């Protein structure tokens, strides 16, 4: 595997550096985090660069640049302080519809290309069904030529502002043998109620409870095939977990560099604290974690581009990077001392964000279970 960037990838990364240097984005991010607002202006700037077309096939007007390119872009964005967690649907959200959607559904989602606006997200988790997805109780019921959706979802990302969601529900006519199907739902429909939740971190992307009370749908609103809901979302889970891991790495790298600059400038006892062995030890351990994360992610990206990535690979990336990145940020905060906990330093935001990622997108525990099964399966 050669992870040297090619000319096209170098151009993308250079473009990211130029964009991030074009204005004081950190002030904008801090404002969006404080107000729990999606940074649409920033995402629009990325869309103008073609970032939302990186994985779209060329036949649909995309760049089909591959996951190594996505990894390079996400790593650089994160290193420079961008909240890449708001971009999870940007590289792959269009492709999901190109694979699974009807032409009408595809047209509705592709209309958001280049806008930077949030377009859709999945609604799977429920109050009684988190990691235990098989306990879903939201139902769809056919009656008089229509389909009616009833139930509730919780912790649904982006759902305060997305115009569409894809809802996983079980067939109300098959209580003994669950049939799970997804439905493409316009959020403006009658019977939908959204309650925005407050979060510890990841505040630039909304998280909501959604209730469905006899929401009327048509058969044409089915997303994918009936009964194929679980199979479809498995691929989405892997994609999301890889992107979460990329975000974790980039954020950790940003805090590492902030802390390194501080350690070389902060003087105590007559010299820079970076000359103290205890501080050097912290940076050695942070560097080991960062290097391990980077190599793991680039290998996974290469596997994705070559069709060999597995759910185990995605789980490994998600688990290791979520934990290692949080440890890096926590250590960097220790280096910064009072500046890191009492001021307005961005590390406080990063610390909150990364703690959430050990739960969201699949908990640490579920990643371990997925990875353990995948590892042992190779030796059966």
Curated annotation (Swiss-Prot):
Pathway: Amine and polyamine metabolism; carnitine metabolism. The keyword Oxidoreductase applies. It catalyses: 4-(trimethylamino)butanoyl-CoA + oxidized [electron-transfer flavoprotein] + H(+) = crotonobetainyl-CoA + reduced [electron-transfer flavoprotein]. One of its GO terms (biological process) is carnitine metabolic process. Transmembrane segments: none annotated. GO terms for cellular component: cytoplasm. Keywords: Cytoplasm, FAD, Flavoprotein, Oxidoreductase. Its EC number is 1.3.8.13. Belongs to the acyl-CoA dehydrogenase family. This is Crotonobetainyl-CoA reductase. It comes from Salmonella typhi.
């Amino acid at each position: 595997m050669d992870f040297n960037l090619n000319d096209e990838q170098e151009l993308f990364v250079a473009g990211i550096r130029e964009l991030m240097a074009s204005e004081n984005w950190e002030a904008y991010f801090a404002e969006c985090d404080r107000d729990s607002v999606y940074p649409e202006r920033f995402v629009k700037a990325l869309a103008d660069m073609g970032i939302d077309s990186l994985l779209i096939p060329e036949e649909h007007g995309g760049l089909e640049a591959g996951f190594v390119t996505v990894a390079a872009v996400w790593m650089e964005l994160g290193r420079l302080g961008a909240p890449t967690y708001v971009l999870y649907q940007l590289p792959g959200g269009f492709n999901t519809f190109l694979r699974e959607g009807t032409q009408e559904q595809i047209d509705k989602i592709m209309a958001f290309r280049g806008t930077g606006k949030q377009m859709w997200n999945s609604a799977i988790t429920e109050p009684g069904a988190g990691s235990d997805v098989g306990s879903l109780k939201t139902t769809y019921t056919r009656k008089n030529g229509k389909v009616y959706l009833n139930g509730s979802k919780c912790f649904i990302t982006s759902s305060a502002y997305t115009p569409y969601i894809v809802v996983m529900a079980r067939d109300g006519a098959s209580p003994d043998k669950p049939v799970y199907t997804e439905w493409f739902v316009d959020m403006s429909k009658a019977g939908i109620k959204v309650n925005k939740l407050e979060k510890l971190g990841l505040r630039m992307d909304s998280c909501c409870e959604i209730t469905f009370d006899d929401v009327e749908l048509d058969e044409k609103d089915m997303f994918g095939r009936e009964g194929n809901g679980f199979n479809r979302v498995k691929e989405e889970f892997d994609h999301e977990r890889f992107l979460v891991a990329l975000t974790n790495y980039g954020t950790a790298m940003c805090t590492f560099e902030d802390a390194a600059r501080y350690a070389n400038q902060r003087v105590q006892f007559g010299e820079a604290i970076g000359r103290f062995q205890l501080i050097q030890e912290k940076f050695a351990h942070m560097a080991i974690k960062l290097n391990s994360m980077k190599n793991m992610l680039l290998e996974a990206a290469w596997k994705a581009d070559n069709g060999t990535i597995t759910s185990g690979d995605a789980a490994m990336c998600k688990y290791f990077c979520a934990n290692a990145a949080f440890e890096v940020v926590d250590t960097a905060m220790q280096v910064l001392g009072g500046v890191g906990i009492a001021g307005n330093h961005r590390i406080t935001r990063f610390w909150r964000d990364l703690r959430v990622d050990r739960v969201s997108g699949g908990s640490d525990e579920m990643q371990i279970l997925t990875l353990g099964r995948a590892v042992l399966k190779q030796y059966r």
